[in-house]
C-alpha cells in the first residue's frame, strides 16, 4: 500500500506527463509558419498510418524536418540535465550541486572550441566536445582517487581544479581563434542553442543519454541511501563507493551528451531538481522521474520562447540564466539553505 508521499509523487508525475504532451503538441505549431494543432496531429500520424493529406508541403517540412528534431532534442537535453543535477545533489548531499560540478561542461566547452579552431564539421565539434567532457571527469576521478581524505570532498575539489583548467584552455583557444569566423562561432556555441538541429544530432545524443538515464532510473531507490551518513549506509549493506561511482558515471555521460549537442545551457540541472522536490518530496523514487519530465517541459518552454519571442533567435543559454539567476538568489536567502 502506497504512502501519502507516494500517491502525491505519482499524481504529480502523471500531471507533468500530461503537461509535457500538451506542450509538445503546441510546440509543433509555433513558429513563423504557424500550423494548426489538428494538422500537426495528422502530419505526425501520417508517418505511421496512411492519412489523406489535408496540409501543404510547407507545413510538413516545418513540422517534420525543422521542428521535430529540435523539439525532441529540447526534451532530451532538458530531461537529462535535470536528471543529472538530481543525481549529483544526492551523491554530494549538496543542494547547490549542478551537472557541471565535476568539470564536464568545462571539458566539453574546450573540446568544442578546439574543434571549431581546427575547422571540424558540426558532427566533429559534437564528437570532440563529448570526448573532452568525459576526459575531464576521468581526470577529476583519478585525482580524487589518489588524494587522501573524504572522497566526496576530494571529488568536489578536483572538479573545481579541472574545471578551472579547462576554462583557461578554452579562453586561450578563443584568444588565438580567427576573430572573423572562428571566434563568433565559438562564442555562439558557448551560449547554448538548439538552432539548426537535425535528426542525426538527435540520434547521436540518444545513445549516451539512454546509457546514462536508464541505470539512474533503475537505481533511484538506492540513490536515496547516498543521502545518508556514510557509515549508516554501509551498515545497511550498501557499497557506497561503488554506487557513487555508478551514479556519477551515469550523470557524467548525460551531462557530456547534453553539452556536446546543445552547448552550455546552465541552471537547468540546478533549478529543476529543487522545483521538483517541492512537488514530490526528496524521495528519488519519485523525484528522479518527476525531475526528468519537468526538465523536458522547462527547456521545451524556454526554447519556444527563444525561437518565437524576437525576429532574431535568442541563445537558449541566455534565457535559462535569466530564470536561474533569480532562483539562485532565492536559495541564498533561504534560512534553511545548505551550503
Report the location of each language-model feature.
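Alpha-helical transmembrane segments in inner-membrane proteins
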Residues: 1-339
Amino acid at each position: 500500500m502506497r504512502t501519502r508521499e507516494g500517491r502525491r509523487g505519482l499524481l504529480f508525475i502523471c500531471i507533468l506527463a500530461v503537461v509535457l504532451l500538451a506542450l509538445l503538441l503546441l510546440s509543433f505549431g509555433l513558429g513563423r509558419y504557424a500550423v494548426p494543432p489538428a494538422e500537426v496531429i495528422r502530419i505526425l500520424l501520417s508517418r505511421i498510418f496512411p492519412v489523406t493529406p489535408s496540409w501543404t508541403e510547407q507545413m510538413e517540412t516545418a513540422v517534420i524536418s525543422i521542428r521535430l528534431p529540435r523539439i525532441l532534442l529540447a526534451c532530451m537535453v532538458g530531461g537529462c540535465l535535470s536528471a543529472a543535477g538530481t543525481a549529483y545533489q544526492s551523491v554530494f548531499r549538496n543542494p547547490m550541486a549542478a551537472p557541471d560540478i565535476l568539470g564536464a561542461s568545462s571539458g566539453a566547452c574546450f573540446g568544442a572550441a578546439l574543434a571549431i579552431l581546427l575547422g571540424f564539421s558540426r558532427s566533429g565539434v559534437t564528437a570532440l566536445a563529448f570526448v573532452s567532457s568525459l576526459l575531464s571527469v576521468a581526470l577529476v576521478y583519478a585525482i580524487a582517487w589518489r588524494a587522501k581524505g573524504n572522497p566526496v570532498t576530494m571529488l568536489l575539489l578536483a572538479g573545481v581544479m579541472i574545471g578551472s583548467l579547462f576554462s583557461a584552455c578554452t579562453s586561450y583557444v578563443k584568444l588565438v581563434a580567427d576573430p572573423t569566423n572562428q571566434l563568433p562561432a565559438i562564442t555562439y556555441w558557448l551560449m547554448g542553442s538548439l538552432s539548426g538541429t537535425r535528426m542525426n544530432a538527435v540520434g547521436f545524443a540518444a545513445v549516451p543519454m539512454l546509457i546514462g538515464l536508464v541505470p539512474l532510473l533503475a537505481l533511484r531507490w538506492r540513490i536515496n541511501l547516498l543521502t545518508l551518513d556514510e557509515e549508516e549506509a554501509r551498515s545497511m549493506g550498501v557499497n557506497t563507493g561503488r554506487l557513487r561511482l555508478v551514479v556519477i558515471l551515469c550523470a557524467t555521460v548525460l551531462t557530456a551528451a547534453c553539452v556536446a549537442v546543445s552547448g552550455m545551457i546552465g541552471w537547468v540541472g540546478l533549478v529543476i531538481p529543487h522545483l521538483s522536490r517541492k512537488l514530490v518530496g526528496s524521495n528519488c523514487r519519485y523525484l528522479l522521474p518527476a525531475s526528468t519530465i519537468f526538465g523536458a517541459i522547462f527547456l521545451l518552454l524556454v526554447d519556444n520562447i527563444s525561437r518565437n519571442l524576437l525576429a532574431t533567435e535568442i541563445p537558449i543559454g541566455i534565457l535559462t540564466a535569466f530564470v536561474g539567476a533569480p532562483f539562485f538568489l532565492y536559495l541564498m536567502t533561504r534560512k534553511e539553505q545548505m551550503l
